[in-house]
Structures are given as C-alpha cells and as structure tokens.
C-alpha cells in the first residue's frame, strides 16, 4: 500500500513491552506513553496477520526491552509462520547470550544490539547498569548462532561522542556486519537529553572520507558507508530531516494497542484496542483491523516536510 505522499508501507515495528532492565538517559520509549494494557501474543499475531495482507513483509520487535517478554520466542515463531520474510529485533543485549540460539531456531532473521560505549565506565554512564562485558558476550553469541547481519546501534551524544572511532574499531574486531550511528531524537526522555545531542555532521564527513563506497538505503534514504574492512556504517539522522521522512516505510504497533503512524506524533494514531478486546469472531476482528489499517495509511504523513 502506498500512502498519499507516495510512500510504500513495508515494515511493522512492534513494541512488546515498556519494561526495561536498563535506564538509558535518552530513552525515547518508541514515542509511547501509558501502558495500562499489554497486548497478548495472540493480539500481536492477529495484527501482524492483517498487516501482512497489506503487503507488509518485515517486522522489527522492540520495547522497552523485548527479551524481557517470556513469550518472545513464541512471538518470533508465530511471525515466521505467518510468512514474514524478515523478522528482526532490537535489544540491549543483556539477556542475549542465553537467548540467541533459541531465537535463531524460532526463525529470527537478524538482530540489532544497542551498544553505546566502548568501556564499562561510559556504558554505565549511559545505561545506568554495569553490563558492558555481558552485552559483548551477547553480541558474540548472536554472531556465533548466525543472527546475521548483526548490527550495533550507537546513539551519539556528549557522553560517548569521543568514542565513535574506537567504537568502529571495536565493531570491526568483534566481527559485526554493520553499525548504526544514530542521532539522539527529542522524544520521551530524549526531550530532556537533547542538550547532549550531536548532529553527526563532522562524524559523517570523516566517515565518508575513510570509506570506499557510499550507498543510499531505500528505507529513510539513509546514507551507508562501506569501510575498507567491509564494515558498513549507516548514519541515521531523522531530526528535522524531510528526506528521512520521505523514505519512511514504517507503521508501529504500540504495546497498548495503537497503530502509531510516526515516532514523533502522538496525535496520528488509531486505537485498535477495542477491536482486539471485543467479543467478535476472528474473521470480524480481521475485517475491522483491516479498516483500521486503511485509516492509518490514509492519515500517515511525513513529520518533517519541505515547505513550499
Ligand atoms: N531496549 C532495546 C534497545 O535498547 O535496543 C529496544 C528498545 S530501544 C527504545 C530501540 C532503539 O532506540 C535502541 O537502539 C535505542 O538505543 C534507541 N533509542 C532510544 N532512545 C533514543 C533516542 N532518544 N534517540 C535515538 N535513539 C534512541
Ligand atoms: Fe531500555 Fe532500550 Fe530504553 Fe535503554 S533504550 S532504557 S535499553 S528500552
């Protein structure tokens, strides 16, 4: 399905929980508030089934910390059984060492692990937890079991900015395939943390110079740089960036049952909780959810647009 701004809808981002075992000072919580209701595995799979009918073929699981959901492995298995081509997850990696193999067996295709530091000290300053070594173990397990490509997310801010180039080195040594250098978004706690924002301009200029190839990804038109080692560095700069929004192919399912059309917008949402909780047959629920998707696609609009 294409929205009225010509953007295809291809990707469903599902928040599985708001609970987290870390306290990152900038956490945007996927732009969600309130979690009086937590969608069940059945709710999630039903919405995913309907999304699939709209041509959506890739799912990203997120949170909170998705590995804290006890039914995570079953959710992944259910998504693959629905026929999703690409099922991936973003995690803080704390529980990954023991989960990686189970997730791989359930069909998880690939993984993003957030690692915002190259040392125990900075890691703790950012996440509030002394877990750097443990997350590194998790990353190694993901590589070992073949959850590839393994990508690392690094949200750049004043506490870790000086570590970016060492982070690239560390990633190369670990053997990960790709890293994402992400601009801090002013959403959730990110609003307060925005004073520590870095626009990534200088960092990107330097990376471009040392790279051997530049590519532009279809999703968000994100620039990617291939380094001589083969490591891919993707630069994620959404803030006040109309080009990024023009390439947005994503819709979000919030943990409390809303179709959220944009990370930044709290108004552009369709509440589907009544449908999910309603005493309807599954066929009727599917029909109603389909209509909700149609409305969500109709109201979807880029948050940052060029002014004419
Ligand atoms: N707990 C998991 C994790 O940290 O990877 C998944 C949820 S987290 C909200 C999803 C991604 O958003 C992570 O890579 C995290 O670093 C990133 N993130 C969180 N707050 C952010 C912010 N204010 N700006 C940019 N990225 C942010
Ligand atoms: Fe937890 Fe992820 Fe938010 Fe950090 S960014 S507090 S790990 S949900």
UniProtKB/Swiss-Prot annotation:
It catalyses: GTP + AH2 + S-adenosyl-L-methionine = (8S)-3',8-cyclo-7,8-dihydroguanosine 5'-triphosphate + 5'-deoxyadenosine + L-methionine + A + H(+). GTP binds at residues 13, 60, 90, 151, 250-252. Pathway: Cofactor biosynthesis; molybdopterin biosynthesis. Its EC number is 4.1.99.22. One of its GO terms (biological process) is Mo-molybdopterin cofactor biosynthetic process. PANTHER family: MOLYBDENUM COFACTOR BIOSYNTHESIS PROTEIN 1 (PTHR22960:SF0), MOLYBDOPTERIN COFACTOR SYNTHESIS PROTEIN A (PTHR22960). Belongs to the radical SAM superfamily. MoaA family. Catalyzes the cyclization of GTP to (8S)-3',8-cyclo-7,8-dihydroguanosine 5'-triphosphate. This is Probable GTP 3',8-cyclase.
């Amino acid at each position: 399905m294409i929205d009225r701004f010509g953007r295809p809808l291809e990707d469903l981002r599902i928040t599985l929980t708001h609970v987290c075992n870390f306290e990152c000072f900038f956490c945007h919580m996927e732009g969600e508030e309130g979690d009086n209701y937590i969608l069940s595995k059945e709710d999630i799979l039903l919405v995913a089934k309907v999304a699939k009918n709209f041509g959506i073929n890739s799912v990203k699981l997120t949170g909170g910390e998705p590995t804290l959901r006890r039914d995570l492995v079953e959710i992944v298995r259910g998504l693959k059984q629905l026929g999703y081509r690409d099922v991936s997850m973003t995690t803080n990696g704390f529980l990954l060492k023991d989960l990686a193999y189970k997730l791989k067996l359930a069909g998880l295709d690939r993984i993003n692990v957030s690692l915002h530091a190259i040392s125990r000290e900075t890691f703790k300053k950012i996440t509030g937890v002394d877990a750097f070594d443990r997350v590194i173990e998790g990353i190694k397990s993901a590589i070992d079991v073949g959850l590839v490509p393994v990508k690392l997310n690094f949200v750049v801010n004043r506490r870790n900015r000086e570590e970016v180039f060492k982070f690239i080195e560390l990633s190369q040594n670990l053997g990960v395939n790709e890293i994402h250098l992400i601009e801090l978004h002013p959403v959730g706690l990110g609003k307060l943390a925005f004073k520590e924002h870095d626009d990534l301009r200088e960092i990107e200029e330097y990376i471009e110079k040392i790279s051997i190839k530049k590519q532009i990804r279809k999703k968000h038109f994100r620039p990617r740089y291939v380094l001589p080692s083969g490591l891919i560095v993707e630069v994620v700069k959404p803030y006040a960036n109309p080009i990024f929004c023009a390439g947005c192919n994503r819709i979000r399912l919030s943990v409390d049952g809303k179709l959220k059309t944009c990370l930044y917008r709290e108004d552009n949402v369709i509440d589907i909780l009544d449908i999910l909780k309603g005493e309807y047959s599954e066929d009727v629920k599917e029909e109603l959810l389909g209509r909700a998707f149609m409305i969500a696609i109709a109201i979807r609009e880029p948050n940052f647009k060029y002014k004419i």
